[in-house]
């Protein structure tokens, strides 16, 4: 049957990408349908119970700046919060939280069920329908056809998923859930370029069988950080600690003894795993000189005894899993609640996507999450929001939301995917960004909220809070510039106490704050330096960073401006690169294959040299002259 209601946007999949995509589309006013094989697993944390970290926390803040759900759900479910790299530069400081799985899933479910313009329906999707080269809807397992002008596919690890434990394997999307075999086969029929990747998860341990007296405690930070601009510490549940143990030479010998039954080493697994989150057997094989690896025991929640041993993801046989776990200090009597496993799944070459995450071959079809070759909740959620928003923009025939590399980590992520592709699961790091001083956690809202508000992603209350913060920052920076001190105005002992030396000339608070050995708090101890208004910690942090890093930021802005012409210059859809004089055969082939949208994208394709970019620019200018 054909369902009687036609939707603007259909989202397939209810993981981190799918939930953000559906919420984004519905927030923008589009009639949206979220299809999932099981409503009970919406927003489920399939692997580790944590959100954020270096690079990933930056993505979460960007999501939040655009009205996304992940940061707020984390504030409602986080049972341990830490600020990483707190003593380092502002660019690499990041927030990470352990989340209660049950509370996190409940927070996402509540947002979904209370979101206007959003319908939920429980059915696996087995087919997509096309009208020529345009998407027109989907068909579910029981034959219901849902019509829509745009479809966002966020199938995660479910497309033709295969689970491995030792030499045993079976079809599945994750433990306990079926694979989307029919949909995977249908997408292959559409000739979309694809490959196989793999990821894995560790065995889970019953906390009642852990001897915590032998472990090192790792408490959260005090005061407790907050993840969302719409959140606060009062939202947080009870806070708990993580614990640290280590592998040892006995552990490593046990792991090696299972190599002959490892699906990774016996060729049973074809997919490539994540480089920066390798299985324990891969670590022992690659780093044979190391006698020990640190393992974090992370609580899964407040109402369960289950612990996640971060660092021993494995697909080794279950008897080896038991032995390796029990070889570690504090885990001698550990009971495993769930075995670790590896999962192989289909992904589609993201070089077949536009910067909007729409496929180049099928109009109105958008991909987000692990289907694009990424790994991680945060990477998936960020893509989901962007794809959901751009699906609405596509339906409305409006310009897509495109984020530049110097504007957002999400811009870096998408640009990397569509220009370089992936040969292993892609994870976000701060080192991937050329302009990371611009892309800090603390200024995500200043970079993105206005763009989100313009297209309806950001609500009125968040917009009001954003403007109050922005205006407070501007007022305080202006006040610092207009508050002056002379050597005669301050007592000599006060000058030495605050500045470490006597003032040699008149200076304002703005210039004084730029001194490397002086922070805002110390400066405010000067007589008459305190502002008349109460400023939040977030405003003070922004003010201090903007003042201290202004010189570096200005230099980066000059560099960005110098490249803007190249970055934004559009390439014609029908350009034939074999006719561009001077380009090598390799460059012509790659450009014709990948069809970059801008010269900037072309410049980042492997093998495209600066000389080739210069030839492209000449060709385009000649074309413009001929057109005139």
From Swiss-Prot:
FAD binds at residues 13-18. One of its GO terms (biological process) is tRNA wobble uridine modification. SMART domains: GIDA_assoc_3. SUPFAM superfamilies: FAD/NAD(P)-binding domain. One of its GO terms (molecular function) is flavin adenine dinucleotide binding. Coiled coil: none annotated. Keywords: Cytoplasm, FAD, Flavoprotein, NAD, tRNA processing. Disulfide bonds: none annotated. InterPro entries: FAD/NAD-bd_sf (IPR036188), GIDA_C_N (IPR049312), MnmG (IPR004416), MnmG-rel (IPR002218), MnmG-rel_CS (IPR020595), MnmG_C (IPR026904), MnmG_C_subdom (IPR047001), MnmG_C_subdom_sf (IPR044920). Its main location: cytoplasm. Its cofactor is FAD. It is found in: Cytoplasm. HAMAP family: MnmG_GidA. NCBIfam families: mnmG_gidA (TIGR00136). NAD-binding protein involved in the addition of a carboxymethylaminomethyl (cmnm) group at the wobble position (U34) of certain tRNAs, forming tRNA-cmnm(5)s(2)U34. Homodimer. Heterotetramer of two MnmE and two MnmG subunits. Belongs to the MnmG family. This is tRNA uridine 5-carboxymethylaminomethyl modification enzyme MnmG. The lineage of its organism: Bacteria, Pseudomonadati, Pseudomonadota, Betaproteobacteria, Neisseriales.
């Amino acid at each position: 049957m054909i369902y009687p209601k036609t939707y603007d946007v259909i989202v397939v999949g209810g993981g981190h990408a799918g939930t953000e995509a559906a919420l984004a589309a519905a927030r923008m006013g589009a009639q949206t349908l979220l299809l999932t094989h099981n409503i009970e697993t919406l927003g489920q944390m399939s692997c580790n119970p944590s959100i954020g970290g270096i690079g990933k926390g930056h993505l979460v803040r960007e999501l939040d700046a655009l009205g996304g759900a992940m940061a707020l759900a984390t504030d409602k479910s986080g049972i341990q919060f830490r600020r990483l790299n707190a003593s380092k530069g502002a660019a690499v400081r990041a927030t990470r939280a352990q989340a209660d799985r049950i509370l996190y899933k409940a927070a996402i479910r509540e947002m979904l069920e209370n979101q206007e313009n959003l319908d939920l329906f429980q059915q696996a999707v087995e087919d997509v329908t096309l009208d020529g080269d345009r998407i027109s809807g989907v068909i579910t397992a029981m034959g219901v056809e849902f019509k829509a002008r745009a479809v966002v596919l966020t199938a995660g690890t479910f497309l033709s998923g295969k689970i491995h434990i030792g030499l045993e394997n079976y079809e599945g999307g994750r433990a306990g859930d079926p694979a989307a075999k029919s949909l995977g086969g249908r997408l292959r029929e559409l000739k979309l370029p694809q490959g196989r990747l793999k990821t894995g998860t560790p065995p889970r341990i019953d906390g009642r069988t852990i001897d915590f007296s032998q472990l090192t405690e790792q408490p959260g930070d005090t005061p407790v950080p907050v993840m969302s601009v719409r959140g606060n510490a009062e939202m947080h549940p009870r806070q708990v600690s993580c614990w640290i143990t280590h592998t040892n030479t006995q552990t490593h010998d046990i792991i090696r003894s299972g190599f002959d039954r490892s699906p990774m080493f016996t060729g049973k697994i074809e997919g490539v795993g994540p480089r920066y989150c390798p299985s324990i057997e891969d670590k022992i094989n690659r780093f044979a000189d190391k006698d020990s690896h640190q393992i974090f025991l992370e609580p899964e929640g407040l109402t369960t005894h289950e612990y996640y041993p971060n660092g021993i993801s494995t697909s080794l046989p279950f008897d080896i899993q038991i032995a390796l776990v029990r070889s570690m200090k504090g885990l001698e009597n550990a009971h495993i609640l769930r075995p670790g496993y590896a999962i192989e799944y289909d992904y589609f070459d993201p070089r077949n996507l536009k910067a909007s995450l729409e496929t180049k071959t099928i109009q109105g079809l958008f991909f987000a999450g692990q289907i694009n070759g990424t790994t991680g909740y945060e990477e998936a959620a960020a893509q989901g929001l962007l794809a959901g928003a751009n699906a609405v923009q596509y339906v409305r025939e409006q310009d897509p939301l495109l984020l530049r590399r110097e504007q957002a980590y999400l811009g870096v992520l998408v640009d990397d995917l569509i220009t370089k592709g992936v040969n292993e699961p892609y994870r976000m790091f701060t080192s991937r960004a050329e302009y990371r001083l611009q892309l800090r956690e603390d200024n995500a809202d200043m970079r993105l909220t206005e763009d989100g508000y313009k297209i309806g992603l950001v609500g009125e209350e968040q917009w009001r809070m954003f403007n109050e913060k922005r205006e407070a920052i501007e007022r305080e920076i202006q006040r610092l510039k207009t508050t002056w001190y002379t050597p005669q105005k301050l007592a000599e002992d006060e000058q030495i106490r605050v500045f470490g030396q006597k003032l040699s000339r008149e200076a304002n608070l703005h210039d004084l704050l730029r001194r490397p050995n002086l922070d805002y708090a110390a400066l405010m101890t000067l007589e008459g330096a305190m502002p008349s208004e109460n400023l939040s910690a977030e405003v003070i942090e922004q003010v201090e960073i903007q003042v201290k890093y202004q010189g570096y930021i200005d230099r980066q802005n000059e560099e960005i401006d110098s490249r803007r012409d190249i970055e934004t210059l559009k390439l014609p859809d029908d350009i034939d690169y074999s006719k561009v004089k001077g380009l090598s055969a390799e460059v012509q082939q790659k450009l014709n294959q990948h069809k970059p949208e801008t010269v900037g994208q072309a410049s980042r394709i492997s093998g495209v040299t600066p000389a080739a970019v210069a030839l492209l620019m000449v060709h385009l200018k000649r074309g413009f002259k001929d057109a005139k």
